[in-house]
């Protein structure tokens, strides 16, 4: 009898699950779950260039099956939507599950009246080290941008740069002083040209210039964005060892995890991989064979708090640390959740922080703070993030796509 009563009292029935697609500068997909006692939770389901697919997956399939369930039963709901779909994994399915999971953790932490990081096990550090993006169309521009971010207090800085002889290069803003936004609005992706030879010849010159001017005080990061073959990546990693990079990111497409062994055999430059992964299975071989140093999976794409916690725990056995993807195409809801996760997770490495426009942050009033290179999620119960539905409605969805890349002879390549 007592047991039944206790179960009944702990039941927090879900009465509403709503999906919002809004474009305050770029598209975001937000899930809002409401319980019968009025507690709400938010989850991010944004999948850049495929937002409507995740929105319909949630609206048509998951939201109706959430109604009447106990919001406290996060693990059971996660398993139900993962195993119950029969078709497991994949970016659309996992982004939808991630949003549900994030919203339920928001609710649970609010019900417990504590910030999410406390519910996860409390802070493991004073603050969350974040890295910023710096770019320039020339080395001098990149150095100026680096200096600006250094003055802001960033301890970890990613550098990208325009390459002589190439009209387009990954990581460039559309114009001087503009924030970098990879997606282009319209019905068709932008096509960009790529030359591995020009990249391999030029990029070490950028790192040399940065280290010569600024020294080794900051962690230096660089994103290769899946562009190189394994042997090219091995050669590149070897050639930049003197610059003591914090990591080289996504050196080669990671579907073939075996090929990272070849890179490892040739260079001690640390490797970070995983922003396009959507489950622990994508990470398994890379982690257990110690072929990478940082795992970049995200809360929005890899199963929410529940999925990411498994990945991080597994990675900790092999001294692989987290370095979660954090561009502005994951919404402020994901960033809020990520900062709670990062503050708690024992094997934390670094968190990417690209930042958001004022317009975006008006739609998603946030509670996190930045101080001298470190962020903190704040002490509000739950994720500490809100969603202004009325304002969001003023920014309807606009089709936008990430670019595609072609080699100079026209061959479609990895963007």
UniProtKB/Swiss-Prot annotation:
Its cofactor is Mg(2+). The keyword Transferase does not apply. It holds the Pfam family MR_MLE_C. Binds 1 Mg(2+) ion per subunit. Keywords: Lyase, Magnesium, Metal-binding. The active site is at 170 (proton donor/acceptor), 225 (proton donor/acceptor). Substrate binds at residues 48, 133, 275, 296, 325, 329, 352. The keyword Magnesium applies. The record marks 327 as: Important for activity and substrate specificity. Belongs to the mandelate racemase/muconate lactonizing enzyme family. GalD subfamily. This is D-galactonate dehydratase family member RspA. It comes from Escherichia coli O6:H1 (strain CFT073 / ATCC 700928 / UPEC). The lineage of its organism: Bacteria, Pseudomonadati, Pseudomonadota, Gammaproteobacteria, Enterobacterales. The gene is rspA.
């Amino acid at each position: 009898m007592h047991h039944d009563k206790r179960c009944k009292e702990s039941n927090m029935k879900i009465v509403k699950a709503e999906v919002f697609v809004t474009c305050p500068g770029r598209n975001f997909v937000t899930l809002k779950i409401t319980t019968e006692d009025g507690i709400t939770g938010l989850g991010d389901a944004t999948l850049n260039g495929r937002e409507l697919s995740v929105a319909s997956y949630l609206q048509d399939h998951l939201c109706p099956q959430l109604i009447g369930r106990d919001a406290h039963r996060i693990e059971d709901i996660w398993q139900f939507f993962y195993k119950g779909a029969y078709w497991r994994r994949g970016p659309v399915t996992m982004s939808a599950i991630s949003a549900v999971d994030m919203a339920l953790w928001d609710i649970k932490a609010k019900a417990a009246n504590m910030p999410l990081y406390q519910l996860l096990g409390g802070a493991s550090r004073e603050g969350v080290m974040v890295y910023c993006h710096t770019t320039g169309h020339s080395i001098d521009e990149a150095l100026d941008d680096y200096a600006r971010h250094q003055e802001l207090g960033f301890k970890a800085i990613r550098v990208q740069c325009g390459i002589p002889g190439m009209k387009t290069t990954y990581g460039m803003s559309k114009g001087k002083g503009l924030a970098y936004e990879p997606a282009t609005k319209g019905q068709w992706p932008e096509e960009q040209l790529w030359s591995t030879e020009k990249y391999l010849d030029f990029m070490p010159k950028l790192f040399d210039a940065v280290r010569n001017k600024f020294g080794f005080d900051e962690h230096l990061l660089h994103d290769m964005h899946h562009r190189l073959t394994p042997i090219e990546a091995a050669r590149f990693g070897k050639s930049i060892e003197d610059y003591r990079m914090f990591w080289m990111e996504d050196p080669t497409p990671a579907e073939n995890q075996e090929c990272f062994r070849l890179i490892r055999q040739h260079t001690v430059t640390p490797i970070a991989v995983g922003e396009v992964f959507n489950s622990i299975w994508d990470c398994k071989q890379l982690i257990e064979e110690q072929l990478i140093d940082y795992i970049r999976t995200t809360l929005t794409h890899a199963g929410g708090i529940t999925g990411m916690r498994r990945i991080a725990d597994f990675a900790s056995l092999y001294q692989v640390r987290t370095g979660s993807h954090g561009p502005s195409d994951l919404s402020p809801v994901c960033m809020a959740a990520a900062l709670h996760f990062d503050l708690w997770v024992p094997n934390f490495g670094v968190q990417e922080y690209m930042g958001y426009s004022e317009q975006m942050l008006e739609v998603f009033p946030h509670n996190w703070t930045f101080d001298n290179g470190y962020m903190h999620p704040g002490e509000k119960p739950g994720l500490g993030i809100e969603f202004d539905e009325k304002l969001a409605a003023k920014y309807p969805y606009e089709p936008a796509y990430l670019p595609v890349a072609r080699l100079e002879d026209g061959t479609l390549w990895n963007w």
